[in-house]
Amino acid sequence: MAKEAARVRRRERKNITSGVAHVNSTFNNTMITITDAQGNAIAWSSAGAKGFKGSRKSTPFAAQIAAEDCAKKAQEHGMKSLEVEVCGPGSGRESALRALQAAGFMITSIRDVTPIPHNGCRPRKKRRV
């Protein structure tokens, strides 16, 4: 049995001028997803996807590189203005935001959507180094 030839999916260029950038910054990684107003993903990137491994994924520089890559992909679809939703306690929040602004996007609003418990689950123990 012969294998079927792998299909090459061409990405069609959408013409979307405004969208939402979701910056999810954890202690271990930073993920950036740019969506349209309905929430359909246009472009995404993360520090791990850009080749950073281990503890280097959680650095602000890795978040900046991931945000620049995601911005470049979104600009290919005609995106010009963004609302930014920042989530999580990580160190890449501000640097990802600065990288999106430096890429030429007009940032209309910045929202912090980090979930805060009303005394929910017990937190992790404090590290003793």
UniProtKB/Swiss-Prot annotation:
Segment forming the signal sequence: none
Record flagged with keyword Ribonucleoprotein: yes
Gene3D superfamilies in UniProt: Ribosomal protein S11
Keyword presence, rRNA processing: no
Subunit annotation: Part of the 30S ribosomal subunit. Interacts with proteins S7 and S18. Binds to IF-3.
Regions annotated as coiled coil: none
PROSITE patterns hit by this protein: RIBOSOMAL_S11
Function description: Located on the platform of the 30S subunit, it bridges several disparate RNA helices of the 16S rRNA. Forms part of the Shine-Dalgarno cleft in the 70S ribosome.
Any single biological process term in GO: translation
GO cellular component, as recorded: ribonucleoprotein complex; ribosome
Family that this chain belongs to: Belongs to the universal ribosomal protein uS11 family.
HAMAP family in alphabetical order: Ribosomal_uS11
InterPro entries given in the database record: Ribosomal_uS11, Ribosomal_uS11_bac-type, Ribosomal_uS11_CS, Ribosomal_uS11_sf
Keywords noted in UniProt: Ribonucleoprotein, Ribosomal protein, RNA-binding, rRNA-binding
Disulfide bonds: none
MF annotations from Gene Ontology: rRNA binding; structural constituent of ribosome
Name of the featured protein: Small ribosomal subunit protein uS11
NCBIfam families: PRK05309.1, uS11_bact
